[in-house]
């Protein structure tokens, strides 16, 4: 303990020494354009350049604590398909997945709380091949550029039921993720064999669930965890709440290759941690799924699998092999993905009302544009462990992503102006080697010490081409003339990072204590050449400390804790540092063997971003601009969730109510501003509005029609949102519903799910989700499994996602279409082999990784 305390003290001291200047912002549901404007205002060295309309649909909900502007931009970009190019004095941010169409929506849970880091995959409706994907942010928002008119959206997250919806590539509003709520605390549910604890559900897979699964993703999909969506085609696990889902194997954070190499018959139980504690360190984490697995002590295990789509280009292929001898395990994993999409487009129609009474119209009409990428991932591993004593795990990873084509072309129309053709394409090559070392030591008196160290290098070569032409009959004819503007550039990025983490835990009979910390330091250097010339060097450090206490007294369980984070980001003379605190309480009471209640409460504090605070005006075009606001103040959020679970042999019911209130939230105001020439400029400005009141009621009954064979899951949800601004007041009411049925018998597994389009609301905007209609049929024979996945079934024309803006001066309707996603079929096959006996490998409790290259 003394050594551990000394390490934490040194980390804190080092972090303070490295943090002379910091950039600290708290963005909530802010458009990416607004965020970049805010950061631009906060930057003394750099000018941030971007195309306003290209990034406006992407929203940011993020606490930014960095040492410089480049790191701050990387932070807000997150998992969005964007690239940042840094020059001497100019930073260019662009969407690397250009498309006239975008799938825009928000993932929320049964309490109307955002689901963070959920995995969203857009599949070809014809063959279920992967088109593109994304991850929801801290507010549950997701924006996925896609040229298709419609696609089969698969949303998955630990603790939530996987959502399959055939959606148009447009704004689809809220997408409700339902928790598998038939689990009861301390009660073994016979149909699913589940025991519920204060922070998790412990699921013991049934024979049928194991028999019809070929890997960890299949097994998780069969479990139908509440609010979790498993995308078999994309090999991702998403949360209906929109947040992140973390996958672990024996308490060690697992990669996609690890889950694919997981043999279902080796899984003893699955822990669905639906209320992640502070020890996980990520406030955006919706759930943690931990597979408890028996390991071999002699012999080998291996397998190969492939998925091939029938529409567009789609292929996933994987292979793995593990060899065990005594206390050691040697492993190698390889995965390959290929995506090629032709029919992606994005449409935006806007109406602008001038104070004079005149009305103007401004439209972006999308052309089908291509999209192509391949990924290769190799992982070498070594594990040395003695059960109940120690575990040493070493992994060497190499990730390669090559995207030679990412087009997004549009016809631009505006009242009183000649039409223009916008030609856009991006190319990116990314290579990421990393080394991960983990050690866990079990000590006397039920104590454990776990240490993790990860070093990563990220090399990125990026090419961006953006040109505007006078439209002449057709796109081909238009590009024959000289471009009106050219925003093209090349970027080269190099990043080095080191992540160290240590945790100490002590268990008593009815109580457990966890204390720990993590320190993350990185150095990023991105060079931009072209329309933007810059060399951006970013230094980042982050220190996280936490303490958490969990216990149980007869019918009552609790989990309380507090976390503190100090982030530091510096870019040249610009930077910031700030402490943030996260109190969290979860209580659970068992009323009877069949009925339990759970209450969870947390307080969040959101601060304005540097870009929002900067008094800088940024023009997206001659018609629109974005201002900062130095008078912005932090705002507080209060989140309370009350749920009840009731179970009888043939039926389980989960009921959840959530109330979230934001006091003086930051949202966008839009006002017309008269210029000297008499024309009007529509100015968007972040301001502290009055309030945002969100109420949510969710009911998810599950009926076990035939025990262990046929289950029917239903979902109905009502949400009421009241937004009060300085000059507006809106109230939104929305009702959604859905159903999913799964039949398992013998070697067959058949499932179908359909859900109504979800919608989300913030300020004066509504974001629409997509309808879900997905079918999966698999057949297992000995070590083989064959399957057919149907994405966006009964949607032959693909998906359309919609969103709207209801400002009194500006009204907008946006649609993202994925035309080639409708009725898409994906054929799958896998083969596994093994030999030898097993043992239970020591658990790994920590794991870290870095995939953020900093280029936009």
Regions found by a protein language model. Give the residues of each.
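Outer-membrane beta-barrel translocator domains and adjoining extracellular loop/strand segments
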Residues: 316, 343-358, 404-420, 462-472, ...
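Membrane-proximal, glycine/serine-rich, low-complexity loop/turn segments characteristic
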Residues: 76, 112, 141, 161-166, ...
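Short, acidic Ser/Thr/Gly-rich low-complexity loop/linker segments typical of extracellular
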Residues: 126-141
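N-terminal export/assembly leaders
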Residues: 18-98, 128-132, 194-198, 228-246
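Face-selective signature of the C-terminal outer-membrane beta-barrel domain
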Residues: 375-403, 424-574, 578, 590, ...
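Outer membrane beta-barrel strand-and-loop segments of large Gram-negative receptors
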Residues: 488, 497-499, 538, 544-546, ...
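Short, acidic, small-residue-rich periplasmic hinge/interaction motif at the N-terminus
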Residues: 36-43, 80, 90-94, 98-100, ...
